[in-house]
Amino acid sequence: MTKKFLNIHLTIAKFGAAHGILGWIRVFSYTEKKENIFDYVPWFIKKEQKIIKILPKYWKILKKTFLVKINDVNNRSMAQKLTNYDILINQKTLPKLNNNEYYWKDIVDCTVFDTNFIKLGRVSELIRTPSNDILVVKASNIKNISQNDMLIPFLHPQIISEVNINNKKIVIKNWKQTFE
């Protein structure tokens, strides 16, 4: 993928298996509120280095799974061609956030420091839990810090004292973890 492509589009879901003979297909949403995926249209897929626009026409829920009817997809074999493709959106369709709210895409690749400005590592991913999100931080090559991933609760302001998305920097405090 080109850098430009990565900067414009964001993966928010994935197509699953075709359902029935009329062209319906399962969709697995990655959005926090699963049904919000339908607020972000049009959708796109990347196929053989080309971006293809996908327009959902109808959707319904069957056994906790979204079934979607796509414009111009009228039978099972057409729907099967979409199976396992990531569903992308243009990042400009995302709503503006309030202060101290962040999209995961903006947190990933941030450098994490402690309050003494010691670099602890870089955020590689986030994990959603019922109580709070968790930063997965790839440790830096610093004495007394292991090469294992650090799991840091994303609790602002209890543990996270600063998030600067523009500078890709997160500062943590009050964090007691043994890095052995």
From Swiss-Prot:
Xref: InterPro entries: PRC-brl_dom, PRC_barrel-like_sf, RimM, RimM_N, RimM_N_sf, Transl_B-barrel_sf
Location in or out of the cell: Cytoplasm
Ranges where the PRC barrel domain occurs: 99-179
Keywords annotated in UniProt: Chaperone, Cytoplasm, Ribosome biogenesis, rRNA processing
Record-linked Pfam families: PRC, RimM
GO BP annotations listed: ribosomal small subunit biogenesis; rRNA processing
One GO location term (cellular component): ribosome
Domain of life (superkingdom): Bacteria
Recorded GO MF terms: ribosome binding
Main location: cytoplasm
PANTHER family from the UniProt entry: RIBOSOME MATURATION FACTOR RIMM (PTHR33692:SF1)
Domain remarks in the Swiss-Prot or TrEMBL record: The PRC barrel domain binds ribosomal protein uS19.
Subunit-structure text: Binds ribosomal protein uS19.
Main function: An accessory protein needed during the final step in the assembly of 30S ribosomal subunit, possibly for assembly of the head region. Essential for efficient processing of 16S rRNA. May be needed both before and after RbfA during the maturation of 16S rRNA. It has affinity for free ribosomal 30S subunits but not for 70S ribosomes.
Database matches in NCBIfam families: 16S_RimM
Family to which this protein belongs: Belongs to the RimM family.
Name of the molecule in the record: Ribosome maturation factor RimM
